[in-house]
């Protein structure tokens, strides 16, 4: 899938899809967070994997 803007519930749904039962986390506000990365800009499914719990 191409990179796309993911905001709000669309972003959460994409994280559940990519991360599955591992779950996911948000980075601290002083770093570039997932909203800045995926909503204000675009991100790919590969980018989303970086926010999954290990």
Swiss-Prot record:
A GO cellular component annotation in the UniProt record = extracellular space
Q: Which cysteine residues pair off into disulfide bonds?
A: 7-39, 19-52, 38-43
A Pfam family the protein falls into? Insulin
Q: Where in the cell is it found?
A: Secreted
Q: Which Gene3D superfamilies match?
A: Insulin-like
Which SUPFAM superfamilies does this entry report, sorted A to Z? Insulin-like
The UniProt keyword set, sorted, is: Carbohydrate metabolism, Disulfide bond, Glucose metabolism, Hormone, Secreted
Q: Which GO terms describe its molecular function?
A: hormone activity
InterPro entries, sorted = Insulin (IPR004825), Insulin-like (IPR016179), Insulin-like_sf (IPR036438), Insulin_CS (IPR022353), Insulin_family (IPR022352)
Does the keyword field hold tRNA-binding? no
Q: Name one GO biological process term.
A: glucose metabolic process
Family label: Belongs to the insulin family.
Task: Outline the subunit composition.
Answer: Heterodimer of a B chain and an A chain linked by two disulfide bonds.
PANTHER family assigned:
INSULIN, INSULIN/INSULIN GROWTH FACTOR
Q: What name goes with this protein?
A: Insulin
Protein source organism: Squalus acanthias (Spiny dogfish)
């Amino acid at each position: 899938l191409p990179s796309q803007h993911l905001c709000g519930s669309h972003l959460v749904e994409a994280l559940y899809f990519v991360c599955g039962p591992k779950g996911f986390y948000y980075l601290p506000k002083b770093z570039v967070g997932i909203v800045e990365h995926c909503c204000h800009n675009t991100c790919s499914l590969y980018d989303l994997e970086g926010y999954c719990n290990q």
